[in-house]
Amino acid sequence: MDSDIEMDMESDNDGEYDDDYDYYNTGEDCDVERLDPKRADPEYFEYECLTVEDIEKLLNERVEKLNTILQITPSLAKVLLLEHQWNNVAVVEKYRQDANALLVTARIKPPSVAVTDTASTSAAAASAQLLRLGSSGYKTTASATPQYRSQMCPVCASSQLGDKFYSLACGHSFCKDCWTIYFETQIFQGISTQIGCMAQMCNVRVPEDLVLTLVTRPVMRDKYQQFAFKDYVKSHPELRFCPGPNCQIIVQSSEISAKRAICKACHTGFCFRCGMDYHAPTDCQVIKKWLTKCADDSETANYISAHTKDCPKCHICIEKNGGCNHMQCFNCKHDFCWMCLGDWKTHGSEYYECSRYKDNPNIANESVHVQAREALKKYLHYYERWENHSKSLKLEQQTIDRLRQRINSKVMNGSGTWIDWQYLFNAAALLAKCRYTLQYTYPYAYYMEAGSRKNLFEYQQAQLEAEIENLSWKIERAETTDLGDLENQMDIAEKRRTTLLKDFFPVDA
């Protein structure tokens, strides 16, 4: 009997901590996570930062491998690889299944009249077709017509000898000068691998070696090769250009997911999957929709533009000059939340209500105008918080700059060294990382369907937001904050952040 009572009491005591314990203090698989960083860090991502020369070598190896198998020129090999995301295996398999269809799909040869003879679509037949084109995808008219016989160019209407004409697999023949002018015009417009035949309604692709044979000006040749290289990299799913200004680094990873890559040269961070600013936990498609909506809704800028609000107690105008949303009126010393203007003393228990949008349960029965107003109200709720955290990141950077100046003065006066004060900059860096994640939770919540999963997300979002504001408050008052207290707050905030990402970051989306 007594043992049963004791077990019940233990169970009840455990229940008091269910909310926090279940989400943040399970300690499950701790040993595994220490050994496997992928389990411990939801943002863990293996990648390499490579130079242009490194990537050229990598791509050339793929080209040479395909050349050996199919016995074609590097020019045609690049076309086939470009169309199949640089997957040699896929190209060879399709070549063996239906080589003719492969060449048509890659725009190396034009669609022909349907054939019933299966031999005509075999690899041998396709190879013979390529051999007739010199294995390159183009030929001079002189190869089929005596060089001394003249013909008329359908573009410039000039009559020239046959060796001055070039044609693709489609058979459309044009003089050398017209091809050259056409190529340079296309290159000037930024087109390279997608240059097609000059003939109307013909989409046969011009191979690289024909372009480089006829375009002799070094400037145009360099431009063509630069544009072609960009096309090759963009078509390769495991490669991504660093979006940093004037940066030449290319990131390579076999894990094609929406993880953060940081360039080793310019230190730009971005999403590897889409190349945009890193946006976890929101996936690539949703963030594109959100940013498009933000750009289109111009009235939002006017709504959000004000940097001032009135104190809810004494009504004096207050300007927000820091990143923390825990505000204290300089006049009456009233503590309140910048976002909802609620009393900060009770705000800790009500943070869930502050960050959470309350839908109108009867909205489906309302008029179109009421529904439109409700939709705008919902959007502004999320946008205001999204924009506020963006501004807070900038304001907190200003706080760090002021902090650096104060610490420099202390160091100059003999009050410790820079190493002694490094913990403050570590705290500021963690705060920026946490707030950045929090900012991108709002587009995620905006498009999330109502239900238990959204309720859980908003709960974790509110917990993260509360701990971020606590950390920001302590950093802004760093000189009076206990080191142990600050480090404890850093640990709590990071745990909230990683827990949310583990539960909701759609890395495979």
Swiss-Prot record:
Zinc finger feature spans (RING-type): 153-202, 311-340
Cell location: Nucleus
Positions bound to Zn(2+) 3: 242, 247, 263, 266
Residues that, per the record, bind Zn(2+) 2: 170, 172, 197, 202
Feature: compositional bias, Acidic residues: 1-22
Binding site for Zn(2+) 6: 337, 340, 347, 354
Binding site for Zn(2+) 1: 153, 156, 175, 178
Catalytic activity: [E2 ubiquitin-conjugating enzyme]-S-ubiquitinyl-L-cysteine + [acceptor protein]-L-lysine = [E2 ubiquitin-conjugating enzyme]-L-cysteine + [acceptor protein]-N(6)-ubiquitinyl-L-lysine
Catalytic activity, EC: 2.3.2.31
InterPro entries in UniProt: Ariadne (IPR045840), BRcat_RBR_TRIAD1 (IPR047555), E3_UB_ligase_RBR (IPR031127), IBR_dom (IPR002867), Rcat_RBR_TRIAD1 (IPR047556), TRIAD_supradom (IPR044066), Znf_RING (IPR001841), Znf_RING/FYVE/PHD (IPR013083)
Active site residues per record: 324
Additional remarks: Overexpression does not rescue clustering of muscle nuceli in ari-1 mutants.
Function: Might act as an E3 ubiquitin-protein ligase, or as part of E3 complex, which accepts ubiquitin from specific E2 ubiquitin-conjugating enzymes and then transfers it to substrates.
Record protein name field: Potential E3 ubiquitin-protein ligase ariadne-2
Annotated organism of origin: Drosophila melanogaster (Fruit fly)
